[in-house]
Amino acid sequence: MTNEHKDQIRIVQETVAGKEITFAHVMGGPDPIIYQKLGLNPQVDYGSSAIGIMNMTPPESAVIASDIAVKSCNIYIGFADRFTGTLIITGEISDVTSALTQIIDYFRDTLEYVVCKVTKS
C-alpha cells in the first residue's frame, strides 16, 4: 500500500427501507392519453375522473393500501405492485382523494408509518 492510500478509510453504506409512504398524488381530470399510456381503462367520464398514485416502502404495503382503497371508496385498482410499492387507482375525483386520505390515515395512525401529504393537480 502506498502512503497516499494509508490514511483513507473505506466506508460501506447500506440503506434499509423504512415504513414510509413517500408519494401520494391525485390527478384530477387527466387527459385521456394519460389513461392510455398507463394502460388504464380509457372508457371513463373524463370530466369527473381522477387518477391517484402512491409509492410506499416496504413495497408489500401496496397490497394493504389496495385493500383499504377498495373497501373505503368506489374506486378501481389500475395497478398495484408488491415489488415496487406502487399503487395507481382511478375513479371520481372525490373518491380517489378520499381513498388516498384513508390510506394515509391508516398507515400513519395504525401502522405507524412516516407519511407524506396528499397533493393534487
Where does each model-flagged region fall?
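Positively charged, small/polar-rich N-terminal and surface patches that mediate targeting and assembly
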Residues: M1-S66, V70-F83, T90-S121
